[in-house]
Amino acid sequence: MKDELFKQSPKKQFEFDKSVASVFDDMINRSVPFYRENLELCGNLLAKILPINASICDLGCSSANFLIFLANLRKDFKLFGVDNSASMVEVAKSKAKAYGLDISFFETNLCEFDFFVCDVFVANYTMQFIRPPKRQELLDKIYKNLNSKGILIMSEKILYEDAFLSKNIIELYADYKEKQGYSKFEIAAKREALENVLIPYSQKENLNMLEKAGFKKIESIFKWANFETFIAFKD
């Protein structure tokens, strides 16, 4: 379905409810620059470097796009998805079933999730929705539950510290969304709905959190304007 949720002024803050879940795939493909290309980059990298039967847990898996891509790359992967939205988990399960894929899903708040040890944790555009006081604690749990040589892939919308640059990058991003078919009204309405829901950090703040959690080797593997993907290794 096409995302037309913000053709009218929002009546509430943004949340991943049934209305969002029903149009999520269209929304994210039109709202996150190079979403598919970045997903494929991360998936192909993991398929290339991970051992047989590696376990991968997608934290904030939404509609399971990344997990489905991984499942089709390598049949030996053990795949898990976690999301706090019942509607999103329902969509994810439905898609996985339609493709005949064995993926386990958990519907729970990430801050309350009973973590288990994995080779990889993925947090694509997830941390930005976690309340700031809880982010470090969550990253600490991720690090603790990674196997030796474990990997975290984390994608985030980021802030620029320079006000002039930040203003112009934000305007370029708005231009991008217009080119994807969103009107100026829709862009403004969604921005209003996301106020105090999506809270981005700067690149430096994200790197500091990862380092504080214990990660020693951290690299940026993708960036477009105010979107960036980090890969962090436990050892």
From Swiss-Prot:
Reactions catalysed: prephenate + S-adenosyl-L-methionine = carboxy-S-adenosyl-L-methionine + 3-phenylpyruvate + H2O
GO molecular function: carboxyl- or carbamoyltransferase activity; S-adenosyl-L-methionine binding
InterPro entries: CmoA (IPR005271), Methyltransf_25 (IPR041698), SAM-dependent_MTases_sf (IPR029063)
Gene Ontology BP annotations: tRNA wobble uridine modification
Record: residues binding S-adenosyl-L-methionine: 35, 60-62, 83-84, 124, 191
Highest taxon of source: Bacteria
EC number: 2.1.3.-
Family, similarity comment: Belongs to the class I-like SAM-binding methyltransferase superfamily. Cx-SAM synthase family.
Quaternary assembly: Homodimer.
Purpose of the protein: Catalyzes the conversion of S-adenosyl-L-methionine (SAM) to carboxy-S-adenosyl-L-methionine (Cx-SAM).
Protein name: Carboxy-S-adenosyl-L-methionine synthase
Gene: cmoA
